[in-house]
Amino acid sequence: GSEMCIRDRKNVPQMLKAYICREAYQERLTPDSLYVNLRNLENWAKSEQNPVSKAILHSLLAREYADYMRYNRQLLSGRTALDTDEAPADIREWSSNIFVTKVDEHNLASLQDSVRLLEVSSKEYVPFVVLEDGSRFYGHDMYHLLAARAVDTYLLLDGFRADSLQRMRIAGIYEGMINTYRHRAGAEDATVLATLDYWKWKRTGSGISREPYATYRERKAQVDKEYLGALDNLIREYGAREICAEAYICKADLLRNMGASHMDEALQTCDE
């Protein structure tokens, strides 16, 4: 089981598999085992020489810290923020802002060596159950896997007063991905998908919905207009590729949502 994999220190691929399985099946660790895990992983990440293994360990650490916060939400909500530079040695005494900083540090570190991560296939690291449809178009590279994990981990910071950090980092990850794939030979499909994922997040998960209604309507109209422009650019640039069907579908949906004035255009999009 996952315990065994974690003890086998040299085997990072197995360990990542164990963690991803645990997440997929939503098995929860007890706070005590999380606590022990975090200390072991921290020591290992410091000493690991292989850059890809190191990146994976950072990704796992970010997620474990975020999980630890969520388990202890009640406890942390009553704590006064401590100075980040003077974090107590024992994480059981930390305040939530220190955890947020840790999650952020490890997420950033996990994506630092993007060039190297692009060269590594994620297949040997990922249990089959998790290679969902999306990643086959991304070519199963490790960079995409860790970037997607970092986004998910930042999303776990909801409710910990980290909204602006969360938005800034997630936008940065998507923009970095789009830029990276755009400049990489043979990564057209990944470029299209990263762009669609980015906009999906931007329209649903980037905090627009928390604004007062009048502001929200204006912002949403603005974002929808930008989204339409982005879809048109994708279609213009990659329209001949099979993957671009996704962009056509998104465009038809968007026009339908934008209202009747755009219906004619929506029908025309479907005909294309």
Describe each region flagged by the PLM.
Residues 1-6:
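Short, small-residue-biased leader/transition segments that mark boundaries at the very start
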Residues 12-25, 54-76, 120-162, 185-212, ...:
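Amphipathic alpha-helical repeat scaffolds of TPR domains
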